[in-house]
């Protein structure tokens, strides 16, 4: 019983950091016309999901936010979801 407790103390669980889905070789391009891609990063209430939840890099998060705002302005995405 004590051996099991000691191994748990020595090796704590480390959560692996997620990588940005938009950086890499086969990464999708952020485009304001790609509604299916943009909808994955909008909450149920219509808000843009923060990068700490989606693990998107800061640069790509800004691009994504601008694409979502542009799509909203053009009427491709709703501002508020009821």
Swiss-Prot record:
Chain ranges passing through the membrane: none
Molecular functions per Gene Ontology: small ribosomal subunit rRNA binding; structural constituent of ribosome
Keywords linked to the UniProt accession: Ribonucleoprotein, Ribosomal protein, RNA-binding, rRNA-binding
Region (Disordered): 1-25
Signal peptide residue numbers: none
Gene Ontology terms: biological process: translation
PROSITE patterns named in the record: RIBOSOMAL_S18
Disulfide linkage: none
Gene Ontology cellular-component annotations: cytosolic small ribosomal subunit
Function: Binds as a heterodimer with protein bS6 to the central domain of the 16S rRNA, where it helps stabilize the platform of the 30S subunit.
Quaternary assembly: Part of the 30S ribosomal subunit. Forms a tight heterodimer with protein bS6.
Family: Belongs to the bacterial ribosomal protein bS18 family.
The protein, known as: Small ribosomal subunit protein bS18
Source organism phylogeny: Bacteria, Pseudomonadati, Pseudomonadota, Alphaproteobacteria, Hyphomicrobiales
């Amino acid at each position: 019983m004590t051996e099991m407790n000691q191994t748990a103390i020595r090796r704590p669980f480390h959560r692996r950091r997620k990588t940005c889905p938009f950086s890499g070789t086969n990464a999708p391009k952020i485009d304001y016309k790609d509604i299916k891609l943009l909808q994955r990063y909008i909450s149920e209430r219509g808000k843009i999901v923060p990068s700490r939840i989606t693990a998107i890099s800061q640069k790509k998060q800004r691009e994504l936010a601008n694409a979502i705002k542009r799509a909203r302005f053009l009427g491709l995405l709703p501002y508020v979801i009821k």
